[in-house]
Amino acid sequence: MFCVLLLTGKAAAGWYQVENYEGSIGPNPVHLSLQRYDSFGSGITVEGSYFHDAKQSPIAVYGKISGTSVFLCEIADDREFDRVLVMGSKTPVGTIGCPFSLDLGESGATGTWSKGSDKFPITLKKVASLDDTGEAKVDGTVEIPFWAQTATHRFAGVYEKAGFLVCMNKLRVIDKKKKKVVQEIAFDDDDCDAGMLMTPIYMNVQKQVGRSFEIISVNFRGGSAGYSRDYVFSHRFKDYRLLVN
């Protein structure tokens, strides 16, 4: 599988370098989160997640960084998500024709989003960052917009520093229509392993949806290959509850 797992050793440095931005694409307020990594595969050196504040539906992005220049493509559907971000391409991916073109600065980014005849300016302010590739560093409130979502909810992980480590302290469940947090799931996690398993940080929460159930899986670093905890949505209580086997 293309999405390799993180090293589980406590002393080993990780590979999460994440920067979060707030701003606008044209007249529309947006949030953007980007993770840099040289070895995503297929020539990809940056992956991320962004959403329009009005819609609250995260869109996966991927692309390349060259100096301060960033070029990002959007994932259109589940099939492309699996092909590009899960399995990986046998040949290097290209970014020609992709909508995002950004120039990164110390405090933010500017650029354009263009698709067909539509073209909008982008203005972004850096609001938070996370880096565990060396000594763990967290600046600001780092909230990761995970790729997984349902028709009703999106999910955001709040990452904090705990001693020499960084991990997800809690998971926020956001109602898309109400645009507000409707539940917070805290983790009894003395080892600081929550949300630290998958190479793309945005894949540390995954979903399973059937006709009568919605389950989210939270990934944890630990052991030889990591593990996950499943939370099932209760239609009676209108929240996610830990699924106990």
Region spans (language model):
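N-terminal signal peptide c-region/cleavage motif recognized by signal peptidases
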Residues: 8-11
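Exposed acidic/polar residues on beta-strands and adjacent loops within beta-sheet cores, strongest
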Residues: 14-245
